[in-house]
From Swiss-Prot:
Its main location: cytoplasm. The keyword Cytoplasm applies. It is found in: Cytoplasm. One of its GO terms (molecular function) is myosin binding. The gene is rlc1. Binds to myosin II chains myo2 and myo3. It comes from the Eukaryota. InterPro entries: EF-hand-dom_pair, EF_Hand_1_Ca_BS, EF_hand_dom, Myosin_RLC. This is Myosin regulatory light chain 1. GO terms for biological process: actomyosin structure organization; mitotic actomyosin contractile ring contraction; mitotic cytokinesis. The keyword Metal-binding applies. Keywords: Calcium, Cytoplasm, Metal-binding, Motor protein, Myosin, Phosphoprotein, Repeat. It comes from Schizosaccharomyces pombe (strain 972 / ATCC 24843). One of its GO terms (cellular component) is myosin II complex.
Amino acid sequence: MFSSKENSLGAKRAPFSSNTTSSQRVAAQAAKRASSGAFAQLTSSQIQELKEAFALLDKDGDGNIGREDVKTMLTSLNQDASEDSINHMFESINPPINLAAFLTAMGSMLCRISPRNDLLEAFSTFDDTQSGKIPISTMRDALSSMGDRMDPQEVESILRSYTSHGVFYYEKFVDAIAGSKDSN
């Protein structure tokens, strides 16, 4: 069926030497489970976006992101593509990086980001008084003319439940979609 050095998916297992203690094996397996747990936290849309990003980075189409892929990407973005810069990018993971390793690494990184704080910060740029409220006209304009533009029906469906007296209560909206501040 599969060799003892491969799992059921055909992925290579890290061989343990005869000097490896059982506690070292358990620690290594726990670390592996923790990192794959980050991958499990990704939504299907995040996975799809990350797959698309992976495909863009995999310039030669070999199913792996290597040093040359990163160098090509950095050069095309007019960024520092020196060996030092590339080495820095690969400090925590060894190239080449396959899709599973990329998703796990990105999942781990995304888990450390606080979506609640990021959303509050984004909304606060429209809140001159830092009151947790934004004039509804400002929100309509921003949602229909900036970034991923929304049509009027989409704008109204988002704003409807969090609007009163001509203002959008963005803190309540953020609490609803990213969890309240008490849960973070």
